[in-house]
Amino acid sequence: MMESEVDSEQSRLKREIAELRAALNRKEQCLRELEASVSSDASAEEQVVGNALESPGRAVHTKLTNDDIARYSRQLILPDFGVQGQLKLKNSSVLIVGLGGLGCPAAQYLAAAGCGRLGLIDYDEVERSNFHRQILHSESRCGMSKAESARIALLELNPHCEIHCHSRLLYSQNALHIIRGYDVVLDCSDNVPTRYLLSDACVMLRKPLVSGSALKMDGQLTVYNYGNGPCYRCIYPVPPPPEAVTNCGDGGVLGAVTGTIGAMQALEAIKVIVGLGDVLAGRLLIFDGSSGLFRNIRIRSKRPNCHVCSAQPLITELIDYEMFCGMHATDKDNPLQLLSTDERLSVKDYHAKLQAQPHLLIDVRPTAEFEICQLPEAVNVPLVEILDDSYLKRFGKQLEDKELPIILLCRRGNDSQIAVQHVRNRFPMHSVRDLIGGLHAWTNSVDPSFPIY
Amino acid sequence: MNADGPVVNVHVLFFAKSRELANTPRSKVDLPTEITASDLLELLVSKFGLTPIRDNLILAHNESYIDNLSERILFKEGDELAIIPPLSGG
């Protein structure tokens, strides 16, 4: 075999093995969920028989075990924390929403510190692009539910922690039911609808909400609904327009930045539970990782006319948050449909018919992404330079030739459609098309050894 | 807006999305010593191209949130404004 064939065979086999491992993890997850639902049905029946439909009373710990003392000694000797702090933590329950870049370090520190009960919510499954920041998940757990993967890692860290997995999307119909069972909620989510949902639900159930977020090199942290502090809606009554929201998959993020904020969420949760120090409520912490600067902004107290947390609320039950925000409650991207099919080209057709012909192939991704991988003939013109027309100077001569087909390309085939609309307006006589599905489609349909990010 | 009165030079810090839109992490602007918060917001939005996020940002004067757009803001030389849109990633 030629070297290139060996390469492509190797990457095909590696991908197939990874897919099989992920499928195996998913099957095991289904089995666990089935077993869990059978056993919870059985225990529900027992409770009905025993006439104890109320939430099962939990024994309150009043003493530390010798193992506790040995394990937590370094924090027990903190004068403000001490035995009483440790007992409060041991009797506490924290719900972590999102087991990603924020949720992993937050859960890790809470479990390690001896939090008695952790609830983990995540609808998503572990994949390789998670590992650089979602530090509880591992290669061998690809395809497994993130909540389950985190549970395995956390129990290894601290087997005394009781962990409940909720491997599903949090939405209006299940939120109150799930959140009710916990003392403190951590918003480690990655999207705007979930942030409003959690804030409203926590106001209704009077739970403090430790809210963290991060993107690129920036992080933010505050505690909502604590004391006289505001809720999320007091600060942001109106959701941002979808086009002003960037997710980590598009904007990128450094693991050490999410890690910084996630660890601080654990810290604030511990302070709330133990009653330690000054909780970060009524203040917003802004972390700029690129300059290493932290700032505290004094934010408002409750908004007197807040629709949810004021004395006369207009919203008294949970609403449809995806509709309210005009966005999905995930950070997954939805393929855009801006162009009709005859304005587009499949990667297979491009490969078979056009690639060997004269044409102009313009890759509209940001330069940092172009440097990761690129097709051989592609020239890089980031979308912003298409939209502000600065590309015109660069291609002056080439663009005079109406016979030269112009093909635009990006990572997934969304930005390239925006670029086609713009270029076509300027050159209505040219053939201007984009590649459907972008480089992801190229890897899937033409060249399996081309990297995916 | 009172364009004839005294002006002072104020630092403006941009965070998250506003940094992308303004294309800089910090800038300086000349502002009247007294201005209503809504005029100030308008001025910053048009000067730095912040229209997409104008209804979704925290405007902080010397690290304090400006919560009332009808409020009159008093500036002195070297004051600091911060523009902080929400972050939702995680």
From Swiss-Prot, chain A:
Q: EC number(s)?
A: 2.7.7.80, 2.8.1.11
**GO molecular function terms attached to this record:** ATP binding; metal ion binding; molybdopterin-synthase adenylyltransferase activity; molybdopterin-synthase sulfurtransferase activity; thiosulfate-cyanide sulfurtransferase activity; URM1 activating enzyme activity
Q: What class of enzyme is it?
A: transferase
Q: How is the cofactor bound?
A: Binds 1 zinc ion per subunit.
- The residue ranges of the Rhodanese domain are 355-451
Phosphothreonine modifications at: 62
Q: Which InterPro entries match?
A: MOCS3/Uba4, Rhodanese-like_dom, Rhodanese-like_dom_sf, ThiF/MoeB/HesA, ThiF_NAD_FAD-bd, Ubiquitin-activating_enz
Q: In which pathway does it act?
A: tRNA modification; 5-methoxycarbonylmethyl-2-thiouridine-tRNA biosynthesis; Cofactor biosynthesis; molybdopterin biosynthesis
Where located? Answer: Cytoplasm, Cytosol
Enumerate the NCBIfam families for this protein. Answer: PRK05690.1
> Could you tell me what this protein is called?
Adenylyltransferase and sulfurtransferase MOCS3
UniProtKB/Swiss-Prot annotation, chain B:
Q: Which InterPro entries does this one have?
A: Beta-grasp_dom_sf, MOCS2A, MOCS2A_euk, Mopterin_synth/thiamin_S_b, ThiS/MoaD-like
- Keyword Phosphoprotein on entry: yes
Post-translational events: C-terminal thiocarboxylation occurs in 2 steps, it is first acyl-adenylated (-COAMP) via the hesA/moeB/thiF part of MOCS3, then thiocarboxylated (-COSH) via the rhodanese domain of MOCS3.
Coiled-coil residues are none
Metabolic or biological pathway: Cofactor biosynthesis; molybdopterin biosynthesis
Annotated GO CC locations: cytosol; molybdopterin adenylyltransferase complex; molybdopterin synthase complex
Q: Which GO terms describe its molecular function?
A: molybdopterin synthase activity; nucleotide binding
Q: Which residues carry this modification: 1-thioglycine?
A: 90
Q: Which SUPFAM superfamilies match?
A: MoaD/ThiS (SSF54285)
Any idea which residues bear Glycyl adenylate here?
A: 90
Q: Name one Pfam family in it.
A: ThiS
Which keywords are on file for this protein?
Cytoplasm, Molybdenum cofactor biosynthesis, Nucleotide-binding, Phosphoprotein
Record function comment:
Acts as a sulfur carrier required for molybdopterin biosynthesis. Component of the molybdopterin synthase complex that catalyzes the conversion of precursor Z into molybdopterin by mediating the incorporation of 2 sulfur atoms into precursor Z to generate a dithiolene group. In the complex, serves as sulfur donor by being thiocarboxylated (-COSH) at its C-terminus by MOCS3. After interaction with Mocs2B, the sulfur is then transferred to precursor Z to form molybdopterin.
Outline the subunit composition.
Answer: Heterotetramer; composed of 2 small (Mocs2A) and 2 large (Mocs2B) subunits.
Q: What is this protein called?
A: Molybdopterin synthase sulfur carrier subunit
Name of the gene this protein is made from: Mocs2A
